[in-house]
A protein has these predicted regions:
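Membrane-embedded beta-barrel scaffold of Gram-negative outer-membrane proteins
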Residues: 303-317, 423, 431, 463-521
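Flexible loop and strand-edge segments within Gram-negative outer membrane beta-barrel domains
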Residues: 212-233, 241-304, 310-328
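Short acidic/polar hinge/loop motifs at secondary-structure boundaries
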Residues: 119-146
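Extracytoplasmic beta-strand/coil segments of soluble accessory domains associated
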Residues: 79-120
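Gram-negative outer-membrane beta-barrel transporters
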Residues: 394, 487, 491-495, 515-598, ...
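Short strand-turn segments of transmembrane beta-barrel domains in outer membranes
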Residues: 148-151, 161, 165-196
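C-terminal beta-signal and adjacent terminal beta-strands/loops
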Residues: 497, 588-598, 622-682
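N-terminal periplasmic "start-of-domain" segments of outer-membrane beta-barrel proteins
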Residues: 40-73, 101, 120
Length: 682
């Protein structure tokens, strides 16, 4: 059987299984009050007519992106879900693996704590490619917390937290499906269905399949602009409620093959080339989680909960003759207790335990006679936290948290965090925050994509990363007749006391991950204005300024490959009966510093010293029907592409080969079409 037939068979099996499951569904409405396990997201109630991005009423600086906002773009996965967000930047981390990276508060996504339903997720080896592991149609909402946040979820948040909420087993029974195809020959199929088995017991199955047919080389440098990614992603979730007891649990698996590198279609043409440079990534990931909660005192919101998750992540990564192979296992558990001490006082306390194991084989040279090196990393961390919240009517909220953790590597460390929200008049919210965060660095796991570089990669002895974050913000909601205006301004400062620095500058022939020796900080200022009219028209304009610097070779320099500013404008229009919806997003990404250039053998410099600002335009039109919608759109319609993202592409085996210094889009304009199906739900 040919490979194309196998791919088609996979997709048919997945869709057929879900359709069969859908046909067995009992479409009875259910109303399960899941207050205990969803207490951290109960600030908003989402309906279709509300704004797509909502400012949380909590003490934290938190925005919640719901499905209405996600539907404004294709949003094939989590990495593509921030297209319309002024706060989060998304780009490719390199021109070789197709990995997406985000930046929050001007800093890498490694400093954002990733959560799925309030549990830590996608750490270590999963981190560089994690944003394509969460299919967009599976998500119910995304909450983005900036700066210091709660200590409940651990100590790893430095610039903020991103929490993904999936569609729920206990939601109204129904079936949803999504099919997507674009001009880059990418196909995606998604399906989700849930069923109420009996009173209090529900289950859900989510399925995702994607494949790219053929390769694309728009700049004719002999390298695929994006990899051929074939992914199968399955998730089975359960919910049971009996009296005061609630259980959530589930299992998931991801199987992904990513193929890229030299030649236009290496699947079929590799045999015709004498020595092609190929990049292959093969991932197998297995997940299991459970949540138990028991309501002790409903009048005081007293409850006790036990949450646990276990993951195994296997990655075989080949970069030419270099390689990184890892078998990672991690376990996390948390026991927590919450209660209202009185009308104005709330207390939360808990214990946590985590264990990380990475068995790694590493080959950093193309020399075929060099054997891989074995590296083992193991860390266990036990901790406890206490968090107190004071509220006075709707005007003042104070939240202070302190946690202490003991690491088998770094011994004892303390994490204090403080948040305050004050509402002097109706509609005006003032917030301030301060807090600390820590992070254990697994350099080869988190930066293995840098092995694609021809430079010699060196990793120094690294300490635990440590930083303080401070934030101030103000948002004001004003009604002018039937029009709604929301003005938001915010400033954040992140100050690193210890950091792992990726250094392209000190030595042209080396790429070093070294311990910070000097200052490293980030200042970000953002202002945005949202206007909502009663006539189906809304718009958001935003501007953000970044000042991000670190010490490289004893010099305090701008962080390379980081835009100095971002300006964004989004416009949405729905026709009176909401049959049609039109969305447009325009952004201007400011210029920035490039790493120190080096001389190529032909006498030219590898690149300049800075990159200029560049624009991007995305549009989408959606036609809504009763049980389905059809959407079509285009991305990067300005057709801006970074020139020569792969340096010295004709000789990838040399030290001059460099595909990891990406600062802009690496492929041009793209069009897509898709359909969303929804049965059994409003």
């Amino acid at each position: 059987m040919t490979e194309s037939c196998v791919r088609n068979t996979y997709s048919i099996i997945i869709i057929a299984a879900l359709v069969a499951m859908c046909n067995t569904m009992h479409c009875h409405a259910q109303e399960l009050s899941d207050t205990t396990l969803s207490s951290e997201l109960n600030e908003v109630v989402i309906t279709r007519k509300r704004s797509g991005t909502l400012k949380s009423v909590s003490v934290e600086n938190k925005s919640i992106i719901n499905q209405l906002e996600l539907f404004k773009a294709a949003c094939c996965n989590l990495g593509e879900s921030f297209t319309t967000s002024p706060s989060v930047d998304v780009s490719y981390s390199d021109a070789a693996t197709g990995a997406r990276q985000i930046k929050l508060l001007g800093l890498s996504g490694t400093y954002v704590q990733m959560l799925t339903e309030s549990m830590p997720a996608f750490r270590g080896a999963a981190l560089p490619y994690s944003f394509r592991y969460v299919p967009g149609p599976w998500m119910k909402s995304i909450s983005v917390s900036k700066g210091s946040s709660t200590v409940k979820n651990g100590y790893e948040s430095i610039t903020g937290q991103i929490n993904v909420e999936y569609l729920k087993p206990q939601d109204e029974p129904g079936f949803t499906a999504n099919a997507y195809f674009d001009t880059d020959m990418k196909l995606e199929l998604n399906a989700e269905g849930n069923i109420k088995i009996k009173e209090g017991l529900s289950t859900e199955l989510l399925a995702h399949f994607e494949d790219r047919f053929g390769t694309h080389d728009g700049n004719h440098d002999g390298f695929a602009d994006m990899p051929d990614i074939r992914q199968v992603n399955l998730n089975n979730r359960w919910q049971w409620r009996s009296g005061r007891y609630i259980f959530h649990g589930g299992i998931a698996l991801i199987n992904e093959k990513s193929e890229a590198g030299q030649i236009s279609d290496h699947r079929h043409a590799a045999a015709d080339m004498s020595d092609p440079y190929i990049i292959d990534l093969y991932t197998r990931r297995y997940e299991a989680y459970m949540k138990h909660a028991y309501v002790i005192d409903s009048e005081r919101n007293g409850n006790i909960a036990l949450m646990a998750t276990a993951n195994m992540h296997q990655l075989d990564a080949n970069f030419g003759r270099k390689g990184y192979w890892v078998n990672e296992k991690d376990i996390y558990a948390r026991l927590m207790y919450e209660t209202d001490l009185s009308e104005h006082h709330n207390l939360s306390a808990g214990l946590s335990l985590s264990y990380d194991y990475l068995g790694q084989h590493l080959k950093t040279t193309h020399d075929p006679d060099c054997n891989p090196e074995y590296i083992r990393e193991r860390e266990s961390v036990g901790g406890a936290y206490l968090q107190y919240t004071f509220t006075h009517s709707d005007r003042l909220t104070l939240m202070a948290g302190l946690r202490g953790d003991y690491s088998s590597y770094y011994k004892w460390f303390m994490t204090p965090r403080f948040n305050i929200k004050y509402t002097p008049v109706d509609g005006l919210n003032l917030r301030a925050s301060a807090g600390k965060g820590y992070r254990t660095v697994h350099p080869w796991a988190e930066y293995n994509n840098l092995l694609a570089s021809g430079r010699t990669m060196v990793v120094d002895q690294l300490k635990q990363e440590e930083a303080w974050n401070y934030g101030l913000s103000a948002d004001y909601t004003l009604y002018v007749g039937s029009h709604k205006l929301i003005l938001n301004t915010e400033y954040f400062y992140t100050d690193f006391k210890s950091q792992a620095v990726v250094d392209y500058d000190t030595s042209p022939g080396m790429l070093t991950i070294s311990q910070l020796n000097g200052k490293s900080y980030s200042h970000t200022f953002q202002a945005d204005l949202t206007w909502e009219s009663p006539f189906g028209l809304s718009a958001t304009g935003a501007y953000r300024l970044n000042d991000v610097k670190s010490t490289y070779g004893g010099k305090l320099l701008e962080k390379p490959l980081t835009s100095r500013y971002k300006a964004l404008l989004t416009v949405t229009y729905s026709t009176p009966l909401e049959l049609w919806q039109f969305d447009a997003t325009f952004q201007m990404n400011g210029g920035g510093r490039l790493p120190a250039p080096y001389m190529l053998p032909d006498g030219n410099m590898s690149w300049g010293t800075r990159f200029k600002a560049f624009p991007q335009l995305n549009i989408q039109a959606t036609r809504w029907f009763r049980h389905f919608s059809i959407y079509a759109g285009g991305e990067n319609l300005t057709n801006f592409k970074q020139k020569n993202p792969v340096v010295w592409s004709h000789d990838p085996w040399s030290e001059y080969f460099e595909p990891t210094t990406v600062w802009g889009p690496i492929h041009g304009a793209m069009a897509y079409v898709g359909i969303r199906v929804n049965f059994g739900r409003l």
